[in-house]
From Swiss-Prot:
Role, per record: RNA-binding protein implicated in the regulation of several post-transcriptional events. Involved in pre-mRNA alternative splicing, mRNA translation and stability. Mediates exon inclusion and/or exclusion in pre-mRNA that are subject to tissue-specific and developmentally regulated alternative splicing. Specifically activates exon 5 inclusion of TNNT2 in embryonic, but not adult, skeletal muscle. Activates TNNT2 exon 5 inclusion by antagonizing the repressive effect of PTB.
Tissues with expression: Strongly expressed in forebrain regions, including the cerebral cortex and hippocampus. Moderately expressed in hindbrain regions, including the cerebellum and spinal cord.
Gene: Celf2
Biological process, per Gene Ontology: mRNA splice site recognition; post-transcriptional gene silencing; regulation of alternative mRNA splicing, via spliceosome
Family designation: Belongs to the CELF/BRUNOL family.
Identification of the protein by name: CUGBP Elav-like family member 2
Source organism of the structure: Rattus norvegicus (Rat)
InterPro entries, per the entry: CELF1/2_RRM1, CELF1/2_RRM2, CELF1/2_RRM3, Hud_Sxl_RNA, Nucleotide-bd_a/b_plait_sf, RBD_domain_sf, RRM_dom
Amino acid sequence: MRCPKSAVTMRNEELLLSNGTANKMNGALDHSDQPDPDAIKMFVGQIPRSWSEKELKELFEPYGAVYQINVLRDRSQNPPQSKGCCFVTFYTRKAALEAQNALHNIKTLPGMHHPIQMKPADSEKSNAVEDRKLFIGMVSKKCNENDIRVMFSPFGQIEECRILRGPDGLSRGCAFVTFSTRAMAQNAIKAMHQSQTMEGCSSPIVVKFADTQKDKEQRRLQQQLAQQMQQLNTATWGNLTGLGGLTPQYLALLQQATSSSNLGAFSGIQQMAGMNALQLQNLATLAAAAAAAQTSATSTNANPLSSTSSALGALTSPVAASTPNSTAGAAMNSLTSLGTLQGLAGATVGLNNINALAGMAALNGGLGATGLTNGTAGTMDALTQAYSGIQQYAAAALPTLYSQSLLQQQSAAGSQKEGPEGANLFIYHLPQEFGDQDILQMFMPFGNVISAKVFIDKQTNLSKCFGFVSYDNPVSAQAAIQAMNGFQIGMKRLKVQLKRSKNDSKPY
């Protein structure tokens, strides 16, 4: 195996090799002899651009003799500059695998932000060990390696057979078998999987492809993400259960804002929910109705709707102001069309307070216990619509709703469709192993995700550790920012912020 002609020509300089022979560096390090027939050519990413073959040789040689190193360089630069990745071939397969186990996702080189990425080059994948290695489960603990070889040798040449044993040297009831080709391994699976129940086993024999390193990392990340999302859900549910006492506090703030006409302190709420002074006044009145409903629901008042109805009568809207015969029900219908309650609830869900959600829940409960009387059917219908609109924002705290949403939004992974202004997020500091599905699952609890994309380096085929998520509304985006910005995954904390508009020079 020789250095490809495309390798960049550098000045010839003599390098002293560990075996005492001299060798020239001409874009790669070559030896006069050849590597083993089963040697693996490895791709290595996340290396400093300033490193040459000499520094890389010093990095790899502790794991075995190096046959060849080829740094990928950008020919458009003069002189050509390293792309931060290379190919390395050891003399033995064992040395390559030992280097991968010691370096991949473990060692971070000076000046780099992410650990080394080391895997078989694309040219090696056609016959990679991981594609020919089988896991054999439900094996009798009385079997040894020879018994397993005899059992699987009819399907082709076996390169390796190993039974997993505990510290005491006893079999754990499973084994690994590596064939010479993938076709042999596939034939063994078809013929042997669940074909018999061996002595001392409770289930038929299991024959399948062994988990790859990527499978193991993906499963570890999924478990870690599931644990962290469970913690987030638990914290959110704790906030939801204690919302009853928040209504009076925020009712006072809203009343103060509407009575003083000085809404400067609430500018953030206005911008987030798109509210004007009239809408804030409506919200304050509705909160008062919620408080009255909470009181009347626990009292023996024969007509608990009276105080609530009087409070609802004060609701105003552009429609009600221009129509002399408008009723409280009409005012409520116009209020629901404004989306005010949904905006405020969505902006605060799962964080410190969800006063709008609590108010609507109390109001819905108080009215629902009394039935539809005295012409309040229109009002009840409007309240039900408003409350139903808010319920979607509690999905972050309800695992069942989360699971349903997961099934509905799988098509969003990998797409790059943009949502409305203010609904598109930029996420940085993603783990190297995260893909489109991982980022989708992480941000789905906060609303309807229409696209989720992790960006990949076209040269190295590795994640750039950032991506974009788009919702169908700005409220969900704000909820995701407040909940996930600074959220820790492994050793990193996510950076979540709004994606800049197309008018800006940079997307983030």
